[in-house]
Amino acid sequence: MRAAGILAGAALAAMAAAGVAQTAPTDRKAIEARFDQHISSADQLAWLKDMSSAPNHVGSPHDKANAEAILARFRQWGWDAHIETFHVLYPTPISTTVEMVAPEKIVLGGQEPPIPGDDTSSRTADALPPYVAFQGDGDVTGDLVYVNYGMPEDYKDLARRGIDVKGKIVIARYGTGWRGLKPKLAQDHGAIGCIIYSDPADDGYAQSDAYPVGGARPAGSVQRGSVADMPLYPGDPLTPGIGATLNAKRLTREEAPTLLKIPVLPMSYGDAGKLLARLGGPVAPAPWRGALPVTYHMGGNGGVSVHLAVKSNWKLTPAYDVIAMLKGARYPDQWVIRGNHHDGWVFGAADPLSGNVAMLSEAKALGELYRSGWRPARTIVYTSWDAEEPMLLGSTEWAEQHADELKQKGAIYINTDGNGRGMLHAQGSHPFQHLVNAVAADVTDPETGASVAARARAGVLADAFDRTGHVNETALAAAEKGGDLPLGALGSGSDYSAYIQHLGLPALNIGFGGEDESDGVYHSIYDSFHHVTTFDDPGLKYGAALSKVVGRLVLRLADADLPVQRYGDFADTVAAYLGEVKKLAADRRAEDAKRDRLTADGAFRLASDPLKPVGAPAPEAMTPEFDFAALDGAVKTLRQSAAAFDGALAARGAALSQAQRDRLSVQLRDIDQLLLDDRGLPERPWYKHLIYAPGRFTGYGAKTLPGVREAIEERRFGDAREFVGRTAKVLRDYAARLDQARATVEGK
């Protein structure tokens, strides 16, 4: 899955001014130069071609073969490595049926057709058919209703037009929110089945030429995926909070709250167009219209009836996590953890293997450094996860199985996933924002010869001038001043989730992209070696660049003699989040008042076309005033403590004794765990982080200050008030730890 944040660089001199670890900078540069000598795009191409040569879904022979090959390479390069096996619930289809039964019978679905020039697209004997994991088996027939993206606002639009999905089958298009929310919301509204299709407006011919002429999604392509309720908890649905070992105590399927109850299947836009072309009912509003050559209707009038059936094998399947370690010389019990998964939905060349082979390049280079006599100060742990695609299974089970040890030893988790051509993107824990920017300034962009940081900054400036997409005002202001661009916040959708949001380790997610066309074949049979090397990253030049970026992060974090964090960046970011939450509350109050006034005045009734009636919005509870004083005070304290610590380290860091440095390293290793609340978030206690979480109705997308923000959005006003206090407490605790660390710097 792809990164979706932004960053740019800053000068090395700024690092020194901030007190960021400058342990023998000449030696560091020499080590990084030696590291770069061992990074080879040719290696990555050879590994990628082999690893993507056959279907490698969880439980497939090639998935296991890839894990064993990765293990052998780690050992060849001098790592202490092993495979840790978990036994995870992984349903696979026994049979799938989707067909229109009225107004005429048309059989739909089936395996994706081969494409000339893409050799692997014809190797389907061992490939699973298009399906989604963790849907509810069933055999249903019902009238079809089009629900746009199938998000909460879409159901409000349907209700205003008098359309009810109860007892019906819905068809939703991919996009806007995470796929698993679409059938979950359909189920919550009484639907008996759900179809999800990829509209060409979002990743097909409306975006680029369709594959194989271009890289966009062709008419027969189907996006697979998981539809379990990941915003409730990721990992094995049967073992929440514990590792899915062979003898683990498991829930029954009926007890597992993340499993759906209704059948769900994905569909190509070639097939979806046949359904939508025959659908009647009201014409869909403009925002609902995609790029198919049909008039988009909402249905609900009994014009189209669909038969949908899924039967699955609900078995436990082995997942093979490859774990490799280089032991630290000074701080062996402080771990810098690096991960990327190796399982795909079919061939998985872009997602995940383009990122995995970049990680393997790093591991090879680090192994060569180790053989030549270099030893990291901290232990480096490299992980190649299995079973990420179904629901972050491999990484989550390992995190849950080793939770106590990880809380005691984990210093940071660095993640990559699919990689492509374009700008560097990053999300993560904001104390590491400056470090990421500094590393980006030291790596050359392979297409332009500029630094990765300079290109990212230029991209922000040019996009803002051209009004291309959403403009991040914070990033724009930073780019205009030549400063650090902000990290994005981490939601979910890749293997960092358990580490930051459940265990409280700081985390980063890094990748290149924006100029590749991997979105067009995402989770399909066409995510292939041919597609990657033709449209996504020819020659894997950006694979090598990713290795150099992440390798530097690992090296600097492993060898840092002084803290690399800038806590002022974190404090400023939290202050900005609080400003957003306050604005959200004020905007909601104003919107509620306007809605109630227009309803009372009959404006919606008078504005509605009598021949195409649209009712007034349903009444909702008025958003009240909130007392944010506790959070205001906590953020003020955090900013003061962060500024004081950063300033003290900049002034005195170089003169600290080794004993002071060791004490600082211990004090700050687990500081991010103070941002957890063991009671967790409302209705989903697995997620414990009170600054970053995946949204309940966004999935992959992050919600910051989630306990407060989501409660306001969902009109759980009592929860909002409670989490003002709970969030304030974790911020005060965090500030107090910074004060203790400053005392160490000052020799107190």
Give each language-model segment a name.
Residues 23-30, 37, 49-164, 169, ...:
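Noncatalytic luminal/extracellular "stalk/propeptide" segments of secretory-pathway proteins
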Residues 105, 136, 217-283, 331, ...:
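Metal-dependent peptidase/peptidase-like ectodomains
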Residues 147-214, 329, 333, 345, ...:
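A conserved hydrophobic secondary-structure block that centers on an alpha-helix together
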Residues 653-748:
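C-terminal amphipathic alpha-helical interaction region
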